[in-house]
Design a protein with these regions (language model features):
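A structural signal for well-ordered alpha-helices, especially hydrophobic packing surfaces
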Residues: 44, 74, 78-81, 102, ...
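Preference for long, well-ordered alpha-helical segments
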Residues: 120-178
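Alpha-helical bundle segments that constitute or directly flank the non-heme di-iron/ferroxidase center
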Residues: 21-55, 115-139
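Conserved alpha-helical segments that form or flank metal/cofactor-binding pockets of metalloenzymes
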Residues: 58-95, 158, 162-165
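Generic structural concept
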Residues: 30, 34-37, 41, 67, ...
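Carboxylate-rich helix-loop segments that flank metal/cofactor sites and access channels
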Residues: 9-17, 76-129
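Alpha-helical scaffold segments that form or flank carboxylate-/histidine-based iron centers
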Residues: 28-36, 57-75, 114-118, 143-155
Length: 178
């Protein structure tokens, strides 16, 4: 099993199979990885905004950690794209952010509703989970698949943590009369 350090460490090019029996074309692998880079960059920015916009110190710290994690994931994926001879994406896109579920985060932040912020972060994580699941359905080289599976597991853990916080925030609000 790959630990978090290995999931954020780029592989050397000599360990990178480009194509083989049953694996994707090199350009398709690059395209898949670039899509995940955008997903990670969108998550990085979404979590950065969430960290800056909440008052709860636990949420602020958690969102900052998730933002850093997504930045590291994107860095690993960018190195993989370079090692395959491709030009890696360097940022998310407005269209990508909308598609990936981060669009309502600013509204949630301006309302000072932490449960709404958690809902929007969870929605963003749902989109990231789906993007990784779609990528993992492809016939990727084993070394790339291993990295994506580890990153996917970390995203699932983040999603579950956010969901847990959101659910406990809902119970807290209900018990306080809000």
């Amino acid at each position: 099993m790959i630990n978090d350090y290995e999931a954020t460490r780029p592989m050397t090019t000599d360990a990178m199979p480009v194509s083989g029996e049953g694996t994707m074309d090199n350009d398709d692998v690059i395209s898949t990885l670039n899509g995940l880079i955008e997903t990670c960059k969108d998550g990085e920015e979404g979590f950065r905004e969430a960290a800056a916009g909440v008052k709860n110190s636990e949420f602020k710290s958690l969102f900052a950690d998730f933002s850093l994690q997504r930045s590291q994931f994107a860095g690993v994926l960018q190195e993989l794209v370079r090692s395959l001879g491709g030009d890696p994406e360097s940022e998310g896109s407005i269209a990508g952010a909308i598609h990936r579920g981060w669009i309502d985060l600013k509204t949630a932040l301006t309302s000072n509703d932490e449960k709404a912020v958690l809902n929007e972060c969870e929605r963003g994580e749902d989109s990231a989970k789906n993007a990784y699941a779609e990528a993992l359905e492809q016939a990727l080289p084993a070394n790339i698949r291993d990295i994506l599976e580890q990153q996917s597991q970390s995203i699932l853990a983040a999603h579950n943590r956010i969901k847990q916080l959101r659910d406990s925030e809902g119970h807290r609000s209900a018990s306080s009369g809000f």
